[in-house]
Amino acid sequence: MASSLSFGSRFLIALIRGYQLVISPLLGPRCRFNPTCSQYGIEALRRFGVIKGCWLTVKRVLKCHPLHEGGDDPVPPVKNNDNREH
């Protein structure tokens, strides 16, 4: 599946994976959502490509704070394949 992703999507996914491996263990579990914001970002980038995937991820991270109740918040389904970058 990775071969069908754009360079930008693969690069951003690698950055998120780096965060998951290096920074996240130092901070401990903080995300209020399921899936976690980093996993959400990876799925959004895979599903929608760089532009929409980044937009969805930024919106999600901005909601992840103590005043928001959190809970289940999956990546929305793809309505058609025209939104996907190749």
From Swiss-Prot:
Pfam families: YidD (PF01809). It comes from the Bacteria. GO terms for cellular component: plasma membrane. This is Putative membrane protein insertion efficiency factor. Could be involved in insertion of integral membrane proteins into the membrane. Belongs to the UPF0161 family. It comes from Photorhabdus laumondii subsp. laumondii (strain DSM 15139 / CIP 105565 / TT01). Keywords: Cell inner membrane, Cell membrane, Membrane. Residues 67-86 are annotated as: Disordered. It is found in: Cell inner membrane. It is a peripheral membrane protein. PANTHER family: MEMBRANE PROTEIN INSERTION EFFICIENCY FACTOR-RELATED.
